[in-house]
Amino acid sequence: MFEKRGYMLDISRDKVPTMSTLRRIVDLLKVCNYNQFQLYTEHTFSYSKHETVWRNASPITAAEIRELDAYCRMNDIELVPNQNSFGHMERWLVHPEYNNLAAMPNGGAVTPWGTIKKDPTTLDPSNPGSLELLSGLYDELLPNFSSRLFNIGCDETFEIKDPEAYLGFLLKVCDLVRERGFRPMFWGDIILKHPELVERLPKDLIALDWGYEGNHPFADETAKFKAAGLEFYVCPGTSSWNSLSGRVENMRENMAAAEAAGRRNGAKGFLVTDWGDFGHWQPLAASLPGMILGGWFADHGPKANRMDLEEALDSVMGVPLGGTLLRLGTLYLRGGALRANASELFRILSNDRGYSRHPNLTESVLVEISAVAEGCRHAAAAFTSPTLYGPGAVWAEEIVYMANLVDAACHRRDERRLKALREEHRRVWLLRNRPGGIDDSLSKFPRF
C-alpha cells in the first residue's frame, strides 16, 4: 500500500465540474480508498484581479474550494491545491495584459513531438513580473486549503531551452511556496531530461514522475529520484483522454508499471491523473475504470490485476453496464492501429484536415468497430431513465455518448451524424459540468 493515494482531475481543458459532481467524485474516491484529491488548474480559479482569464470558464470560486475542502476532510481525503506555475500558461499569456510575461510572446515553440505551439505557453523566468504574478495567485488561492502540500506543476516548459534557467525559476517558485507554509510538489519531466540537476534539488521537494504508456520507464526514472534522496510519487493515468472511449489495456499496463516501480524504489505516493486534452470530449464514465483500478493498485499492489473490474463498475454505476464500458474501452485495439497518448479513432474525429489515417484502420475494420459501438449504445440506452435508474442513468447516458463518438469517427464524413453529435456533446456535458468551456470544446469538433 502506498501511503499517499491520490486522484487528479483536469479542470482546465474546458470542463469544470459542478459542485454536486465534485462531491460525488469525493464519494467515489473514498470507496476506492484514495486519501488525496487534486484539481489540475491553469485558469479556472476565480482570481479576483484576473477576470479576463477566467471570464467564460465557469471557474471554481474560493468559497467552493473551502466547501469542497471541508467535504474532503469529512471523508478522510486531503484536497491538495494545484496551480500550474511555469508552462501551460497559454490561457493567461494569450491576453495582452499578460503577454509581456511570456518567454516567447509570439508563440512558435516546437514541442518534443515536432508540433508547433501557435500561442505562448511558458512564463519568462527572467522577467520579475512572472514571480510577482505567481505571488499574487498564491496569496489568494492557498488560504482556502487545509492541506500543506501544493502542486506547482512546472511541466512541459517548451520555450525554455536552458536547464539552468529552468532550475533557477523552479527554485524561486518553491521559495514562494515555502514562505506561505506549504511544501512544493512538481512534475519531474523537465528535471529528468537533465539528470545532473536532480542532485541539486532541495530535499523538501516532492517529485511527481508521470508517464501514460504501458511501457513508460518508471523504473529508471524513479531510481534517479531515489538516488537523490527525494520524496516522489508515481503518476500513471486513466488513459481516457484523446481516446473517445478509453484505452483500457494501456491503462492497466501503465498502472501496473507505475505500481511495480514505485513499490521497488520506495515511492511515497501513487497519483492517478485524469487529463482533458483537446477539449475534454470524454465523459466521466470513460475515466471510471482507471479511477477504480488506480485505487486498487495504490492500495493492493499487484493483487489489483486479479480483481473483478466489471463487477466493481456495475456496483459503482448502479446499472449493469461495466462490461459494456470495458468493451468500448478496448475498441482502440481493433486493427492494431495504435499510437501513443491517443487512439486512432480520436485522431480521425479530431482532425478535419491534414490527417492521414493509419493503414491498418481499413474500411472493413471501421465497419466492425461501428457495429460493436452500436451494440454498446443499444445496451446502455436501456438504462437512461432517471425515474427507473436514478444516478445510474447519467452513467448510461455517458456510455451512449461514448458509443456515438466512436460511431461518428467511423463515419467521419457524415455531416448529419456530426451535427447530432455536437448537440449531444452539449447535453451530456451539462449533466455533470458547468456551461463555461463548452464552446471552446466544441470548436475542436470537425467543421463543414
Regions found by a protein language model. Name each.
Residues 1-161, 165, 172, 176-178, ...:
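Feature activates predominantly on carbohydrate-active enzymes
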Residues 27, 67-70, 76, 128-143, ...:
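Substrate-binding groove of N-acetylhexosamine-processing glycoside hydrolases
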